[in-house]
């Protein structure tokens, strides 16, 4: 597995994918890490494999997410899904992937971890 990159991006949601696309357009080597198996983040989760019914139900914004995921997948950026970043140091990201630890070296590290769903317990919410 390659371990030296110009940029390591943590998070494959809309911000992480967009940053990766911009960086690759400038000829930089890019590794995008995400704990989920597929890119898209919380908002475009499973955008690349959504059924026609789901796309119709969710609407036009989801279609834009599908286009972003498709462009990201076709880019020269490397995506490593199922990766857990457990430590950061200047120029280094310590990552566990499929039971093995790796040290990814980068000139820059971008943290784009995005949003997380969180239920807000209100009286009668269940």
Would you name each region that the model predicts?
Residues 1-15:
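Beta1/beta-strand and adjacent pyrophosphate-binding region of the FAD-binding site
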Residues 10-11, 33, 111:
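Conserved N-terminal Rossmann-fold NAD(P)-binding element of oxidoreductases
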Residues 13-15, 38, 115-117:
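Residue-level detector of alpha-helix initiation sites
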Residues 25-43:
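Glycine-rich FAD pyrophosphate-binding loop
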Residues 51-70:
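Short beta-strand to alpha-helix junction loop
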